[in-house]
Amino acid sequence: MPLLELRGVAARYGALQALRGVDLSVDEGEIVAVLGANGAGKTTTLRAISATVKTSGDLVFAGERLPRRPEAVARTGIAHVPEGRGTFAQLSVDENLRLGAHVRRDRAGVKADYDRTLQRFPILAERRGQAAGTLSGGEQQQLALARALMQRPRLLLLDEPSLGLAPRVVADFFAVIAELNEQEGLSVLVVEQNASLALASSARAYVLEVGRVAVAGASAELQRHESVRRSYLGY
């Protein structure tokens, strides 16, 4: 049974139909990528999972229907790092991290995860009293990820994590994601504009076009798929 399964999911913004019956799944311990042009429905797919947009169809997580309130979704074990990072600019690094654990009640576990997070991201430890808005783009992306990890999620949703970042910063970020997946079994659903990076970092991938799944399969196979190569890989 998949950890996450979407069946016939549709969503709209007013008169605009953003998703048109999307079927998608993520297995336990799997990294899955979602590719597509601007307006294809990638971000809306993540918003549908997080219940920040109204949907129809079936959304199932760990064998149960997902609730349709964002905080309730977070309590199920899904953490969402949105496009643009979504950190609270006026709050300190420390305050952002502690807000990430707001759905938890296990104080000892939160303290252990806080310490572990600062060990994983030493620059955040150095700057934990600093306002998030004063951090560099790469540091803000680290903070957004660290805050999500404070939820202790089973599934991590990442929306365009490489956007606006230098190649070295992007490589380091995806190295952390790979480590979390390999060492802790964290499942990841990532929307990514860099198709080459997304396919190299994932086990399976979906290509969305105008709100529908146009192509799906193993990432290694999609790297050889003619239309994917032509439209998204540039060769």
Question: What is each PLM-predicted segment?
Answer:
Residues 2-235:
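Glycine-rich phosphate-binding loops of nucleotide-dependent enzymes
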